[in-house]
């Protein structure tokens, strides 16, 4: 039995920037995302999982399947308990060898399309199941979580997690709607990297996450997950909010650096002080904390403490 799954995940931090640029190639899909439960009568739940994807590792912990993880990467750092699991190396495919993966005798290997595409066929040729993570929207993240729950037999925990995520997303949407006024910002430039400039595009979960809380990525119609854009196009977009991953934990110093860029003083985001650093690890991982991300963005925009009463 063979199952290869492709959704859409692009992690944009790798040795500082784990992200893949460019268009995606289609990979075969053995299970319909709308009906992710395996139907094969000889199906067995995964018992030995090597996870090369930080968001997948987080998900496995979140659905109480962490005991099935036999190996991870150096960049699988959340939750903290993951440190006790052996590592196969860095996130970059060049630092991970097939031999190292096989040494853990996995029955399922979870990998990222952009970084690990070269591992898919060799693993399948050896009869090892492969899960290709590729989440380009909030719904795809939830679909992926559901599939991981079905592979591991942890459906009760998975459904509880999905209920929590759905509630968090709805709370974020409600809070944003209630606080929004005619003067509230609604266009966003999300900076992944500068000089050259990279930003989430049409195929990024970040673009979809912003839409959930009523914000529009000024590059939402640009193909690819993380396209390179010109500084001129950023200025022309006149974003009312700027978000950026605070890789080096510079906080307000990094905010001032952005605000002082030549020609950026005309941007509404700069004029109104709407430049916000975000957690670079959290916002690079389309996984079980997607609802938390939405609530944090609402808090940044509207200055609200997260309202969590009544959480499932």
Model-derived features: where do they sit?
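Extracytoplasmic substrate-binding proteins
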Residues: 43-48, 118-198, 219-224, 271-312
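A short, structured surface patch at a secondary-structure boundary
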Residues: 47-114, 215-218
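Proline-aspartate-enriched helix->loop->beta-strand connector
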Residues: 93, 97-114, 128, 230-247
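Short secondary-structure boundary segments
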Residues: 53, 113-114, 195, 222, ...
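His/Asp/Glu-enriched short active-site or ligand-binding loop at hydrolase and phosphoryl-transfer sites
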Residues: 73, 203-226, 246, 276
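A ligand-binding cleft/hinge motif common to bilobed small-molecule-binding domains
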Residues: 115-125, 241-259
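Short helix-initiation/N-cap motifs at beta->coil->alpha
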Residues: 35, 88-99, 222-231
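Short, low-complexity disordered leader/linker segments with a strong preference
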Residues: 1-45, 312
């Amino acid at each position: 039995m063979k199952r290869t799954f492709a959704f859409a995940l692009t992690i944009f931090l790798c040795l500082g920037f784990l992200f893949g640029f460019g268009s995606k190639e289609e990979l075969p899909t053995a299970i319909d995302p709308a009906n992710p439960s395996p139907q094969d009568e000889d199906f067995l739940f995964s018992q030995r999982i090597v996870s090369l994807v930080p968001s997948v590792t987080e998900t496995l912990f979140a659905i109480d399947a962490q005991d099935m993880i036999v190996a991870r990467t150096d960049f699988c750092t959340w939750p903290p308990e993951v440190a006790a699991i052996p590592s196969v190396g860095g996130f970059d495919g060049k630092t991970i060898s097939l031999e190292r993966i096989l040494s853990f005798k996995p029955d399922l290997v979870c990998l990222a399309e952009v970084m690990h595409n070269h591992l898919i066929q060799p693993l399948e040729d050896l009869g090892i199941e492969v899960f290709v993570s590729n989440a380009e929207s909030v719904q795809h993240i939830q679909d992926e979580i559901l599939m991981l729950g079905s592979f591991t037999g942890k459906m009760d925990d998975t459904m509880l997690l999905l209920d929590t995520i759905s509630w968090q997303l709805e709370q974020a949407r409600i809070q944003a709607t209630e606080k929004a006024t005619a003067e509230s910002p609604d266009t966003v430039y999300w900076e992944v990297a500068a000089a050259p400039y990279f930003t989430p595009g049409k195929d990024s979960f970040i673009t979809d996450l912003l839409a959930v809380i009523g914000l529009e990525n000024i590059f939402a119609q640009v193909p690819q997950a993380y396209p390179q854009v010109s500084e001129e196009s950023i200025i022309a977009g006149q974003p009312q909010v700027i978000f950026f991953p605070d890789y080096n934990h510079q906080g307000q110093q990094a905010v001032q650096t952005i605000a002082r860029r030549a020609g950026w003083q005309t941007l509404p985001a700069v004029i109104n002080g709407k430049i916000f650093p975000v957690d670079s690890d959290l916002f690079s991982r389309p996984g079980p904390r997607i609802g938390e991300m939405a609530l944090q963005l609402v808090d940044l925009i509207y200055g609200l403490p997260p309202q969590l009463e009544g959480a499932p």
